[in-house]
Each structure stands twice: as C-alpha cells, then as structure tokens.
UniProtKB/Swiss-Prot annotation:
Enzyme Commission number: 6.3.5.-
Record-given protein name: Glutamyl-tRNA(Gln) amidotransferase subunit E
Taxonomy, superkingdom: Archaea
PROSITE patterns registered for this protein in UniProt: GATB
Any matching Pfam family: GatB_Yqey
One function term, GO molecular function aspect: ATP binding
Organism: Methanosarcina mazei (strain ATCC BAA-159 / DSM 3647 / Goe1 / Go1 / JCM 11833 / OCM 88)
Similarity annotation: Belongs to the GatB/GatE family. GatE subfamily.
Subunit structure: Heterodimer of GatD and GatE.
PANTHER family: GLUTAMYL-TRNA GLN AMIDOTRANSFERASE SUBUNIT B MITOCHONDRIAL AND PROKARYOTIC PET112-RELATED, GLUTAMYL-TRNA(GLN) AMIDOTRANSFERASE SUBUNIT E
Taxonomic path: Archaea, Methanobacteriati, Methanobacteriota, Stenosarchaea group, Methanomicrobia
Catalyzed reactions: L-glutamyl-tRNA(Gln) + L-glutamine + ATP + H2O = L-glutaminyl-tRNA(Gln) + L-glutamate + ADP + phosphate + H(+)
Amino acid sequence: MEKYDYSELGLKAGLEIHQQLDSKEKLFCRCPTLIRDIEDSDFEFFRYLRATESEMGEKDRAAVEQTKIRRKYIYKAYDTTCLVENDEEPPGELNREALDISLGVAKLFNMKPVDQMHVMRKIVVDGSNTSGFQRTAFLASDGNIETSEGRCRIDSLCVEEEAAQKIEEIGDSIIYSLDRLGIPLVEIATAPDIKSPRHAREVAEYIGMVLRSTGKVKRGLGTIRQDVNISIARGARVEIKGVQALDLIEDIVRKEVERQLNLLFIRQELLERKAFVCEEIYDATGLFVDTKSKVLQKGIKKGAILAARLRKFNGLVGREVQPGRRLGTEFSDRAKTAGVGGIFHTDELPNYGITEKEVQALRDAIGANPDDAIIMVADEPEKSRLAIEAVILRAKEAIEGIPEETRKALPDGNTAYMRPLPGAARMYPETDVPQIEISQEYFDSIEVPELLTERAKRFASESGLNKELAEKIAYSKYLPLFEALLDTYSDNEHVNSTLIARTLVGIVPEIRRNGAETDNLTDEHFSGVFAAISNQEIAKEAIQDLLTALAKEPEITVQQAISNLGLSAFDPEEIENFIKNMVREKGDFIKEKGPAALGPLMGIVMKEFRGKVDGKILSHMLKREIDSFINQG
C-alpha cells in the first residue's frame, strides 16, 4: 500500500537511461572498449578545468558552481587508451558500429531518426572528461512503449561518449581512470509520463529489456545507469543521477516526493514565522580559542570559524526531510561544494565537544534570538566564506520554495545535492566531427532483433522449457550460447533444452555462490561438457563437479578434467556386480522394506557412481535387482 496518492500530489516523473554499447571500439577513436585494472596504468597526467562561455556568450550555471573551487584532476592512462582520450588529438570519425546499434534501438522504440546527425559538446567540468565537455549527438525522437498505466512516450535517443570513471578523492584532487572514457553509450529519455514509483520501475525494466534484446550492450555493474526526473505540484523539477540498481528506483521516487513535501511544510512554517536570512557573515574564531572541541580546534588551525544567522529558523534546521536527513543536511551538502567537510548548526548543539555555554556566547556575540538558528563552518578562510555563502543561498531558497537542482542517488534511496540544473548554455556544436546523413534507406537496412519477452515465449512453446526457466535463459548473458547448443543438440536423447538451460542459469550461479570463478568458464568448456554427456562419457550428474574443476583450472581441457575427477565411463559389468553385491548385503533391509528399499539404496549407488553413470540407468538396474531378490525370496 503506497503512503501517498501520487495522482493527487501531481507527480510527474521521467527517466534517462544511459547504456554502454558493446562495440569493439570507442566512439571517436579506435581504442578497444576494455575496462582495465588501475594497477595496469602506465602513465598519468593532470588538468585544471574552468567554465567556458557558450556561443551566446553565457556560462552554464552548473559549470560555474563546480569551478568555484580549484580542483586538480589526475588521469590514469593505459596502453589501450590514446591521445583522443587525453584531449591531445582531435576526435576521429564516429563509430559506425555504435551508430548501427543505436539505430536498431531507435527502431525497437518506434522512433523517428533525424535526417542529419550533428555532434554537440555538452559542458562537463567535474573532471570526468579531460576536455571539459562530453560529445553527444541527438539521433531519434517520438517513440513510445505500452505499460500497465498507459503509453509512455520516448522523447529522445542520443549517442554519447561515456565519462571517465572516478577512482578516489584525495583532498582537492580527484583521480579518474581513462579506460571507460569514450565508450559508446545511448541515452534514452522518456517524457514525464510516469505516474508512480512502481510505474517508474516498470518503465525502466522494459527499456532495459529492449536494450538487452539487441545483444549488443554491455552487462554488469556500472554499464547501465538511470537518471530520474521528478516533480510534484508546488514543488520543483529535480534530476537524480546515477541510480545503478533497478531495485532503488521505487525508493528514489518515494523518498524524493517525501523530501519535497517536507520542504514545502518547512517553507509554510517559515512563512508563518516571518523568517528571513541575514546575509552578514560573522568571524567567530575568537570565541572558540579555548574550546575543547577537537573539530573546532582543527578549524582554528586551518584559519577560521565563520557563522551566519538565520532569523526564526530555530528547530527547523534539524527537521527531517528524508529518513536520516534533515534541512541541515541540505545546507551541509551546499557547503560541501566549497570543499569543506560540513557545517554545524544550533539545532544539533551542544554536541561535538561544543558546550551550551559556548553556544550561548555565540548567540550573544552575533545578536541571535532564541528563535534564530546559527550556522557555523570551520575551515580555511576562503573555503569557509564560500561555504557560508552557499548555505545562506540555500536558506533563502527554503523560504522561497524548492530549488531546481541535480542530485545524486545514495545507496539507501535518499539523495544528496550535486549542482544546479544545467541550462541551455551547456551545449554548443562540436566542430571537429562532420555531420552524418541518416537516409531512410540506411534506417530501413538496420535489422531489428527479437525482444527478449518474445524469445522467452518462443523457448517455452518450441523448446519445452517451463516459463520460469525460459525467462531466465532469455535474459541471461548465456543466451547466444544456449541458442547455439540448442541447435547442436536439437535431436539428441542425452542433451535436451532443459538440461542446457538449467546448467547455464541454475548450476553456474550455484557454483559461483560456492566460490567458483565462473567468469573463467568459456563457451568451449560448456561445449565440451555437453559433448561428453552426448557421447555418454559422463552422466549429467557430473556437470556441477566438472564445471567447478574447469573454473578452478580453466587452462585444462574437458577431457583432462574428466580424467582428473575420475569420471571416466565405468564398465557396465562392474556396475552390475556392485549392485548385486550390495543387494545381497542389504537383504534383511530389503525383506523389511520391500520395493520401498529402492530410495535408500539408490543413495548408496549414486554415491559410488555419481557423475559416471546416468541416474536413470542406475535406478533401472537397481530396481531390477531388488525386484529379482524379492521374487526369489
């Protein structure tokens, strides 16, 4: 049961899905799309970035805020990256393989391509692009999908280059890895047609399914990201970036609605109190010279403790806006853009070693009343000043309403401030890449793959898989291998579709949970295992042990693994003698249990011959011997 009536609240939401394409080369150079270990980096360099003007002479507001603090961006390069990633060489021609894949995606969403595609530069000065911009090209529009809550329009599809991956932050320096920079991706943006958290997940799932249906997108953590645009009536549009887990989307929408509602409640109370923000910044360093608070002592060593007074904000700065996050957290997020660690506010004091006496002395010194709140920042003088100014601005916004902003998704479904929403000044033409003609003939030549949902239905109807198994294999990364093996063993009595599917989406995950490095398993390994079963060299019960062994030692052949495990085929006479001897030894038990003795005795036989002989054959031989013993008795 949902907490809110989202229709009544006027919820509007849309998604932007960013999916890496599995092309051989990057978008504007011929480097491979390989993800490398940071330890493999063979050189590094650094950059300082600043906001530049658009063709209209304007600077993007998001870029301006991000460059207030001078940061050093360090880039790790590899023998699989080149001067294009370093921004030391102009980009090459746009990757035609990536363009073909993107047009195929556009077809699946019933979109209309542009007649002529132009590459643009999108200003990005967070260090994730060495050039200070991301190359992007608008490719198609006017698509749609059908959902349980009606049609959801697909507004646009763009082809973009992936950003560099952030490795870590050290002080004012940020380290990025260039292996990911330039990998082709598609950005799919929906219209604000999403009506509820569950609807958001449904739309995201469907778009993800369509993308995977191409068989030409990368898989794994970080290869697909969802941005969510959300607003409610009387609220504001907020873009939440970097939702990597599908399971988080519903929580993100719910908690953003909750945040905006709580901010509206706080605004109403501020208006009723006739609250306002004083712009004067006070130097409170001298008040805390003898403080016992270690955090304030560190601030004094850095240079300054600055404070600001928020008239009639007392009690509201500590008001919760999301689970575990308060209005004060919103203030702190803004302050952090100046490079400080956070803020102190009187709604949470005394605390952190700061005494009640020190808080009162601060109130007296700056003329704060009991119903006022005070904000403090302890850091270098310039950082502290910028941080306090950012908090003052955010406090004013709390009175005015909800600010439009870009926020980042947190692991618990909450969000934190990143930067203002970018404006039109963010985009300008890329003059180093020629435009590309998209003719109707070219678009018509792009083949459209079968959707995974349709493929699952086909597997169930044509291959005899149950619905659950058909869906699992259709959505699995092993889909191409499954189809190849299915074709090879279409008329084989020992290897059928169910055995192949259960191996790939049942046994493989199980041995992975048990610690096996299943990424070591190749198509050749699986082909060899099923060939051995087909030739009756091993029984299907041996699959788990055999794959575990191959995952541990991927360099050995299937035949070597069979030999190492002692799984070579047994002489039928040897099996028959074992069963006869066991039946004689267990004669009293068989007389007592009769035919019901089959189950317990089968366990003994399987322990001896598991993986070496098909269980059905063993069961048949044992039953025959038990029946013979009972009849003779």
